[in-house]
């Protein structure tokens, strides 16, 4: 069976943990992860001034699709940049139309709202993004740490990054693999 593939879209201002933890956990599960820089291949300054080097540009990564999951990290500025990008809109709309998984964390789900993706789904966000996300009543809201409704998977923030990542792994390659990856991480139950 061919390896599952993930696209993580990295925008300036992304939250570091919400980017790196899902990438790491998915790679541990054997998922081929591409970290694509929204603005190109140059290192990206994240929300806490950590620089992350993308594998490629989003423009180049788009030509390598489709992906089994598209992941949107949070961070206020990062989510705003994702929300304002026509290319992100195109990728999300294609992913939705082909019934591929879309995963977004923290403020990242606000990009779904901006691009009119996943309307009707139950979602969660960082508590400070809830009002923005619920503007227009396009979604129902959950206080769950991770919420999966059909092919839309959302989570709350940096502290839920491992749960978010493991939920992606479970959705793509199964609960057994998620448990195998989780065990050596020494996470609190």
UniProtKB/Swiss-Prot annotation:
Q: What is a single molecular function from GO for this protein?
A: nuclear androgen receptor binding
Location of Phosphotyrosine modifications: 67
**Acetylation keyword on record:** yes
Gene Ontology terms: cellular component: cell body; chromatin; cytoplasm; cytosol; endoplasmic reticulum; membrane raft; mitochondrial intermembrane space; mitochondrial matrix
Localization in the cell: Cell membrane; Cytoplasm; Membrane raft; Nucleus
Indicate the impact reported for residue 46 to A. Sulfinic acid detected following treatment with hydrogen peroxide
Q: Please give the Pfam families that the UniProt record associates with this protein.
A: DJ-1_PfpI
One GO biological process term is: negative regulation of reactive oxygen species biosynthetic process
N-acetylalanine PTM positions:
2
Induction of the gene: By hydrogen peroxide.
Q: Name the EC number(s).
A: 3.1.2.-, 3.5.1.-, 3.5.1.124
> Which InterPro entries does this one have?
Class_I_gatase-like, DJ-1, DJ-1/PfpI, Prot/Nucl_acid_deglycase
Q: Which residues carry this modification: N6-succinyllysine?
A: 182
Modifications the protein undergoes after translation, according to the UniProt entry? Sumoylated on Lys-130 by PIAS2 or PIAS4; which is essential for cell-growth promoting activity and transforming activity. Undergoes cleavage of a C-terminal peptide and subsequent activation of protease activity in response to oxidative stress.
Report the residues modified as N6-acetyllysine. 148
Co-factor remark: Deglycase activity does not require glutathione as a cofactor, however, glycated glutathione constitutes a PARK7 substrate.
Q: Which family does it belong to?
A: Belongs to the peptidase C56 family.
Q: How does it assemble?
A: Homodimer. Binds EFCAB6/DJBP and PIAS2. Part of a ternary complex containing PARK7, EFCAB6/DJBP and AR. Binds to HIPK1. Interacts (via N-terminus) with OTUD7B. Interacts with BBS1, CLCF1 and MTERF. Interacts (via C-terminus) with NCF1; the interaction is enhanced by LPS and modulates NCF1 phosphorylation and membrane translocation. Interacts with NENF.
What protein name applies here? Parkinson disease protein 7 homolog
Q: Which organism is it from?
A: Mus musculus (Mouse)
